[in-house]
């Protein structure tokens, strides 16, 4: 267990950092795994796996961080093999799973179309009877990885769908906006040409499309701490994930 020690490092601080990291890894649930949900376009005879390298890079990074064995070449081959066997007539949702023991599996389904604008809810309002904590803990390291331990997220977006919406938004212990159950969120304030999205430090998954948007200067997007009021008062709301792209949304 290491902690990037340099000549100027404080040995006590470095030791404490190692203890924190060790506690995190040793407390991981035995069944926790990782997964990537990937868009596969197979229309008009053209096959393309969207954000292919970005998904594999994230999977590789998280597997290393969580000490989950991963054969990245096998993952790549499985993904490409699966894509080649899908009919070239639609867009598909392809899910690549990595178990705690390093076992790979894959599944796929046709991706349905969405309306031009989707409704989002607040998770704490639509899951009032939930036994899980609905406030994300920003210091939870697992939030930085797309793990299979996402029950409360899944409950939230599934409840939103049952109410005619698409997703539900979460806040953290400080009342800051974090993300949706299956999307990142961007808001554009009134009288501004910038898109704002919560920082990873709020307890946010580094979404593949989110990262791409932030890297593109033409989109004028940046990280900022946001509250419920910022969303309510926003001029525009946009959800994003690599599966669906950018999705116009409303409360």
PLM region spans:
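Helix-start/capping segments and mature chain N-termini
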Residues: 1-93, 97-251
């Amino acid at each position: 267990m290491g902690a990037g020690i340099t000549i100027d490092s404080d040995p006590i601080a470095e030791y404490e950092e190692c203890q924190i990291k060790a506690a995190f890894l040793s407390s991981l649930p035995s069944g926790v795994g990782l997964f990537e949900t990937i868009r596969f376009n197979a229309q008009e005879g053209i096959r393309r796996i969207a954000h292919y390298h970005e998904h594999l890079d994230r999977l590789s990074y998280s597997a290393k961080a969580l000490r989950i064995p991963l054969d990245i070449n096998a993952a790549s081959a499985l993904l490409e093999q699966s894509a080649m066997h899908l009919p070239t007539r639609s867009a598909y949702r392809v899910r690549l799973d990595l178990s705690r023991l390093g076992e790979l599996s894959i599944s796929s389904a046709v991706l349905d179309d969405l309306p031009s604008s989707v409704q989002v809810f607040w998770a704490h309002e639509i899951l009032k009877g939930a036994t899980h904590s609905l406030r994300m803990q920003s210091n939870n390291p697992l939030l930085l990885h797309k793990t299979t331990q996402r029950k409360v997220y899944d409950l939230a977006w599934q409840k939103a769908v049952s109410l005619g919406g698409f997703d539900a938004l979460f806040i953290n212990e400080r009342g800051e906006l974090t993300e949706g159950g299956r999307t990142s969120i961007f808001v554009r304030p009134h009288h501004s040409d910038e898109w704002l999205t919560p920082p990873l430090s709020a307890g946010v998954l580094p979404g593949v499309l989110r990262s791409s948007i932030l890297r593109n200067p033409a989109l004028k997007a940046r990280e900022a701490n946001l509250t419920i009021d910022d969303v309510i008062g926003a001029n525009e709301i946009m959800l994003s994930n690599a599966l669906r792209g950018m999705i116009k949304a409303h409360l």
